[in-house]
Amino acid sequence: MAKQTFLKGTLILIAAGMVTRMLGFVNRVVIARFIGEEGVGLYMMAAPTFFLATTLTQFGLPVAISKLVAEASARGDHQKTKNILVMSLTITGVLSLIFTPLFLFFAPVMAETMLTDKRTLYPLLAITPVVPIIAISSVLRGYFQGKQNMNPLAMSQVLEQVVRISLVAVCTTIFLPYGIEYAAAGAMLSSVAGELASLLYLFVCFKYKKTIKIRKHFLQSIKNGKQTFTQLMSVSLPTTGSRFIGNLSWFFEPIVVAQSLAIAGVATVAATKQYGELTGFAMTLLTLPSFITYSLSTALVPAISEGMEQKKLQVVEYRLEQAMRLCLLSGGISVVILFVFADELMRVMYGSSGAAVFIKVMAPFFLLYYFQGPLQAVLQALNLAGAAMMNSLIGALVKTGLIFVLATRPSLGIMGAALAIVTGMVLVTLLHAATVSKVLPISIKIKEYALSFAVIVICGFISSAIKQYISFGASEAVNLAGWIAASAAIYMILLLVFRLIKKDELRRIPIIGRLIIR
């Protein structure tokens, strides 16, 4: 099975992540165009419940599988790899059988009582079949990740989004005549189809690239898998706890926001619309660049686990430094584009600039958010998943408490929820960094970081001037594309001028690297 280096694997995932995020963004835009702000609100209010259910079913196993498979591969232990897969499939299979019927049974209660809008029942029911699908695909993803073969992961992500986009317009159009809630359910069904296509692709890749036979002595592997089960649980339990806390917080978020806005005197329909603008429009744009940090997180777990298994601490520290540097540089241009062109992005993408104010307030804080995923991946690889879980718990409690405190104030309303969300994100990132620094030295080069922030500010001012004085075409979409391209070029030039990135580093970027140097 082809194994990539840390950098190559990361670049493959970043390329796939860029494509899938763009496709996913198109998917969100299509949904917004077909079912409107109210429909997006119903869709987004049901989504946290879906992620909570899948988190419980996955049980944190993708990270655990990745870590343990990487360690087993470093030792050349193929039998251990088989035991890991057998136990993981058994665990996720049992959990799927438990949580799928429970999800169906409690969906009406969640819709009417907790989410305060009974129309969310239909999107909740539509996503139920995805639970066992994601449970199985997560095991295969963890396996390929642990083998440091990122190609199947990358292709499956792209395939999932292609299928979603291909079906979302059809599904929403078919169900829209029956009501906005049915259209939201149709959008959810397209997501289920995408996940199924992704699973089938991963299964085919595994079947033709595997070096072990899973079905042979399957039951015997389960009986003799006590040690493997314990090792999986030592990583998966705190990882599940961390994700469960995050998803539970997200699950309660629309509930707390709805109740808080009700106290502030906002009607139910208006609250649903405002929450749709914040989470469906603004948060979608703000989290768009996180595909880079997600790719880093995916590649970091096996790379650091392998380094620790082989006791190569210098390699581990170097990987961490690489990851933090890439987070800062990629996050910087993302913040500039989101902050400066917030109104234009919203109008071009959604036909309304109502949520632009959220982006302008939240974008600067999201620079720290882009560090959160890689830092958590490092903690998990260092057997500090429990510490990551506690950090997530603290952040979730602070966020939820602040939502109630701030969103109940009529002067703030939904903006109070936005401020609470970024406060929780920043807090968790800082706690993760503090925890990692106790085990591994995080070399903070003050001059380099100061120059990086200076480049971000300078690029922001230049981008604002470009928007004000330069026109690239008659339509706003053409102007926006020109402004973003110019801003990215200026940012790259500033990085080279201040020597924050070197020419030989640019050459390593596939295809575009050599074009930039020329």
Curated annotation (Swiss-Prot):
Bilayer disposition of the protein: Multi-pass membrane protein
One Pfam family in the UniProt entry: Polysacc_synt
Record lineage: Bacteria, Bacillati, Bacillota, Bacilli, Bacillales
Domain of life: Bacteria
Name listed for the protein in its UniProt record: Stage V sporulation protein B
Alphabetical GO biological process terms: sporulation resulting in formation of a cellular spore
Compartment(s): Cell membrane
Keyword Zinc part of the UniProt annotation: no
GO cellular component: plasma membrane
Entry-linked CDD domains: MATE_SpoVB_like
InterPro entries named in the record: PG_synth_SpoVB (IPR024923), Poly_Biosynth_Transport (IPR050833), Polysacc_synth (IPR002797), Spore_V_B (IPR014249)
UniProt keyword Membrane present: yes
Primary role: Involved, directly or indirectly, in spore cortex biosynthesis. Affects only indirectly the expression of late sporulation genes.
UniProt keywords, alphabetically: Cell membrane, Membrane, Sporulation, Transmembrane, Transmembrane helix
Major place of residence: membrane
Family: Belongs to the polysaccharide synthase family.
Gene name, Swiss-Prot/TrEMBL: spoVB
Membrane-spanning intervals of the chain: 6-26, 45-65, 91-111, 120-140, 165-185, 186-206, 250-270, 281-301, 326-346, 348-368, 387-407, 411-431, 446-466, 478-498
